[in-house]
Amino acid sequence: MVDVDSIGSANFRRELSFTCRTYRNYVCNRITYGSIVPPFVLVAVDPGTIDTIVETIDNEHRLRIEDGLCQVNTGDWDGESNIAPFEEHTIYRGLYQRFVDGDEWENTVRFQYAKGQIEQFGSFNNYESVESFRAIRCEFIDELYESIRRSGYRPNRSDTHIVPSIDIRNTKYRYFHKLEPLVAIDRSGQYHWVDGFHRVTLAKLLEIDSIPVNVLCQHPESI
C-alpha cells in the first residue's frame, strides 16, 4: 500500500502512519472482538441502498480517518446528531444539478461552495482560483462521469480515478483517497458513507448496482 517513490516526503509519512495504525487496529480488535473486516479487504455494496453520511466534522464524537481502517469505536459517532442524509450534501446536490439537470458547473451549489471558500480563504482543496477549480477539478469530474457511464465503475486501486496532481486528494490526503469509498457500520449493522462522495454520487446517478468499499470503522455491537 506504500508508494516507495515518495519516501521521505510528508505524503509518505502520512501513508505509513495510516497503514501502521490500520494493522495495529486490526490486531488489537481481532484479539478483543474476534471477527472484524480485515485491513484493505474490499466489501461490495449497492450504493443506492446507503443514503446517509457519518459526519466527520471536528467534534468530540467524530470518526477520524487518519486513525486508520479496522477501527472499532464504542463512542456515539453513530448517534442521530452525527448522521446526515447523503442527498443533502453539496457534492450530491451539485453533481445532480450537473449531470441530471444539465446545469453549467457555475450554476451548481458545489461550484458556488468552492467559489465561496476560495474567495474567503484563498484556496479550496489546493485550488487557489475559481478558474483553476473550473478548468481542472470540474473537468476531471466530467471525465470521470463519462468514464463510468461508458465503461462501468472500476476499483480505485486499478488507478482509474487518478485525481489531478494539484488536488489535495493527490497530496495531503492521498493516503486514503487511493482507497475505495469509506463506510462505517453502526451498532445496528447499517452502513453509512464516510468519504469518497464524488465516486459514490456518480455511481448513484448512473444506477451502478455494486461498488467496492473499504470499512473505516465498526461499532462493537455490529460485530
Residues covered by each model-derived region:
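Short alpha-helix boundary/capping and kink motifs at helix termini
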Residues: 106-192, 216
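A basic- and aromatic-enriched beta-loop-alpha substructure that forms the phosphate/nucleotide-
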Residues: 60-130
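Non-membrane alpha-helical secondary structure
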Residues: 4, 8, 12-15, 19, ...
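Generic detector of well-ordered alpha-helical segments enriched in charged/polar residues
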Residues: 17, 24, 28, 51-54, ...
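Surface-exposed polar/charged interaction patches
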Residues: 4, 10, 22, 26-29, ...
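A short, basic-hydrophobic beta/loop patch
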Residues: 22-40, 49, 55-57, 71-93, ...
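Compositionally biased, charge-rich terminal segments
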Residues: 1-21, 65, 72-82
